[in-house]
């Protein structure tokens, strides 16, 4: 029985790469794939799905006025699977049309996309997918601080995190960065830099402690085997207080 799948993740989590690899796997088994993308995504060419690792493939472009179910019947009725990239930009009606392909044609549909915008608001298309998808999977990635990234932060020309503006503003690594919820709180990267500095201090303390431990160990060996300060052990006690 076919299912509607939604695989979501923050920017840079390999969503497009996984979509293209899934397409390759189906085609390697002589299966016909209908790859689609919304017309609003024109970053890498209007009819191309592109991944940061260099993979790319031509796709059927879907405009907001298109009925995906009707297009499927007209253009690709013999497809074995439908794969959608940037699915968050589809309308709620178009998500229902993908659901209809699954139910009436018994064809699996795999949707890849973002969950939320730069203000952590759910995209309408993604919201509908959460409501009607049979299988929902998170594609995980990390923030620059090492925590799990869930926020698609929009970066302004001044390098600060933007907190207002239109929901849709196309861009790649120059405009967006996947972050955890903590990093963009101060609206800039000072918090991360501060944390990095603190981690550096912690590392320095660790190195100092290790050095003191080695020094104490060496002195202890000399004391044990060569009898240094044996007559007055208190002279070496201070070494063990470092």
Placement of each model-derived feature along the sequence:
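Walker B catalytic acidic pair
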Residues: 86
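Phosphate-binding/switch region of NTP-binding enzymes
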Residues: 124-175, 186-188
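A short acidic, amphipathic alpha-helical/loop segment
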Residues: 22, 93-101, 125
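Residues immediately C-terminal
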Residues: 89-90
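N-terminal amphipathic/hydrophobic targeting modules at extreme N-termini
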Residues: 197-212, 217-222, 231-234, 239-240
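Conserved P-loop
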Residues: 1-71, 117-128, 141, 170-196
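Sensor-1/coupling segment of RecA-like P-loop NTPase cores
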Residues: 102-125
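Low-complexity, intrinsically disordered or signal/transmembrane-proximal segments
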Residues: 224-226
